[in-house]
Amino acid sequence: LAHWYHDPRLRGVCNHSTRSHIEQVLRRYLFAACFAEGQGRSPQLSDFPTSLLPDHSNVESALEGSYFADRFRVQLKTRHATTITSHISKDGHYYIHYDPSQCRSLTVREAARLQTFPDNYFFVGPRTSQYVQVGNAVPPYLAHQVAQIVVRVLTGGASKPARD
């Protein structure tokens, strides 16, 4: 996929700035990334020390396993990423970067990369809108592959599949 992503005309990376987080969230992200690195899995809410639990009304239900037990999800470098959805625009809790030294959620560009947007695709508007654009999109490489099949079907197989 390198040729799909890379554009030699670019002299940098766009949409790759991190969002700010309050100190308590940074502590949770640091714990989550360290836990994932050591355990090879993203932590469940029940794995968090009590001092790092969020002050939300549904935490008790989450600790009982009812829902939101995976509220803080690390995108592990050794596994496929989870599906990027538009919820990433609300907070980055489900999209924590795996490197503990970075202690942050994914940038728009990283989320876009996971969705297979080429690096030369520029997202406009406020960052929240950019995350929504990425999360609501059909992955471009998937759309490209489906389009090639549709063309072959409509042309009776006359067009040769591109080697992407």
Model-identified regions with their sequence ranges:
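C-terminal target-recognition/interaction regions appended to catalytic cores
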Residues: L1-D164
